[in-house]
């Protein structure tokens, strides 16, 4: 993004509009996203991306292109669902397009407004991109191995999970909430969220194994 004078100029206009709390914030975000999508990625960066894919993901046919911003998972600001990630990406061209879409999601009108309300400056926000192999899964979600409200509390592992692999990270539905106690050595479903029924015994066993692995990795 720093290589494009037009993008830098648009970022400057957006910063000024945010300082003035101007009405033009939304159209400025839309224009900035358009510029990011249409601007060609520099050759050196394309070369680095290609080398990294060959070195780490050779032979992979289907990819996930995920957002990874420093302006998420913060105290008082989770940013769940406001940045874009893309599944079922199957070509080099689509990978590059998805990377630009992830970058553009940092300056969507919604994400900019929510960060402004949380007191997070645009100057302090950056977006990384994680490219992974897409694998078949029975369910997906987010696991936290420390109490989010108390980092010194390691007694429980918290898992938000959904039978639809992408629901939790997209923030599109309320997930099941599962709690595993490392003190008691057992787990339970705290909330079903939008699900109509709980996971079966094998599903619970998988979550317990996952919680133990997460704690060991920690």
How should each PLM-predicted stretch be described?
Residues 1-130, 139, 205, 218:
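N-terminal beta-alpha lobe that positions the nucleotide/phosphoryl donor
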Residues 157-218:
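Conserved catalytic alpha/beta cores of large enzymes that bind or transform nucleotide phosphates
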Residues 66, 77, 86-88, 98-99, ...:
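Beta-strand scaffold of nucleotide-dependent catalytic cores
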């Amino acid at each position: 993004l720093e290589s494009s004078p037009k993008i830098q100029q648009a970022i400057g206009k957006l910063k000024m509009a945010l300082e003035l709390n101007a009405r033009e914030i939304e159209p400025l975000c839309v224009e900035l996203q358009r510029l990011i999508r249409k601007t060609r990625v520099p050759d050196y960066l394309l070369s680095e991306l290609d080398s990294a894919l060959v070195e780490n993901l050779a032979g992979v046919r289907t990819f996930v292109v995920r957002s990874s911003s420093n302006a998420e998972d913060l105290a008082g600001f989770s940013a769940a669902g406001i940045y874009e990630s893309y599944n079922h990406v199957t070509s080099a061209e689509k990978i590059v397009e998805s990377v630009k879409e992830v970058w553009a999601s940092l300056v969507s009108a919604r994400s900019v407004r929510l960060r402004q309300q949380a007191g997070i400056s645009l100057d302090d926000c950056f977006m990384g991109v994680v490219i992974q192999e897409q694998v078949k899964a029975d369910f997906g979600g987010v696991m936290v191995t420390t109490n989010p409200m108390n980092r010194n509390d390691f007694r429980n592992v918290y898992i938000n999970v959904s039978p639809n692999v992408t629901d939790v990270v997209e923030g599109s539905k309320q997930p099941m909430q599962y709690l595993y106690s490392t003190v008691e050595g057992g787990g339970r479903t705290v909330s079903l969220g939008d699900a109509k029924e709980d996971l079966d015994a094998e599903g619970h066993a998988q979550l317990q194994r996952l919680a133990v692995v997460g704690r060991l990795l920690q």
